[in-house]
């Protein structure tokens, strides 16, 4: 289950896609034009997205991923949310970054995946929290009121140790040696999909 959660199809590197997804989802819960975005990231995610190129653009980084999430991303596509980004979308995102409406804050030092995307308008705000997997939405708020909370939110508190951190090297090696092929056959499918994508020409 852990492997499947971390191997969802994505357009480009998963961290910028996850940021765009979070911002786009928050945007959909705001009943007015967005005037400011505040993005809270853990250090591991911040670092991984900081220098990553974003597909269909010549840009990198957390702020630009958030800006594209605001103007162009489809949250229903999750990590494929930036598929179909146009040159016009890129120009709009450049303007948002230049105008300084995107604030990116590194909250704490940890390798744990966590994104808190807050979008604000003149009268309202919306917030989306993603934790432990790039599309695992654990909370959605509108004007401070929780409208969605994952069933296991109580077990996903910040101080809980993620499952993978509780596994020893021996546990992992034992799993590798004993897992039935059928349970991990999807890994081969992911490799094939990746090979197809890297063989495609990039957009000029």
Q: Where does each model-flagged region fall?
A:
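Generic N-terminal amphipathic, Lys/Arg-enriched alpha-helix
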Residues: 1-11, 47, 171-175
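Short, N-terminal intrinsically disordered low-complexity segments that are rich in Pro/Gly
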Residues: 7-16, 180, 184
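Short, conserved micro-motifs enriched in small and acidic residues
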Residues: 12-17, 56-60, 204
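Alpha-helical support elements that line or immediately flank enzyme active sites
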Residues: 16-32
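Catalytic-core signal marking the mid-to-C-terminal active-site face
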Residues: 33-190
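Conserved small/polar residues in nucleotide/adenosyl-binding loops
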Residues: 196-204
């Amino acid at each position: 289950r852990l492997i499947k959660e971390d191997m969802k199809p994505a357009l480009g590197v998963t961290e910028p896609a996850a940021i765009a997804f979070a911002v786009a989802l928050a945007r959909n819960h705001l009943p007015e034009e967005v005037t400011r975005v505040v993005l809270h990231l853990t250090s591991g995610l911040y670092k991984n997205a900081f220098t990553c190129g974003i597909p269909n653009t010549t840009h990198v980084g957390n702020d630009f991923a958030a800006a594209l999430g605001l103007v162009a991303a489809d949250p229903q596509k999750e990590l494929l949310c930036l598929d179909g980004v146009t040159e016009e979308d890129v120009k709009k995102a450049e303007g948002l970054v230049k105008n300084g409406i995107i604030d990116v804050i590194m909250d704490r030092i940890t390798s744990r995946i966590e994104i808190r995307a807050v979008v604000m308008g003149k009268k309202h705000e919306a917030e989306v929290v993603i934790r432990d997997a790039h599309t695992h939405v654990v909370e959605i708020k509108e004007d401070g009121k929780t409208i969605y909370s994952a069933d296991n939110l109580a077990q996903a508190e910040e101080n809980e140790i993620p499952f993978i951190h509780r596994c020893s090297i021996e546990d992992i090696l034992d799993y590798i040696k004993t897992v039935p092929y059928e349970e991990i056959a999807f890994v081969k499918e992911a490799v094939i999909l990746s090979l197809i994508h890297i063989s495609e020409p990039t957009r000029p």
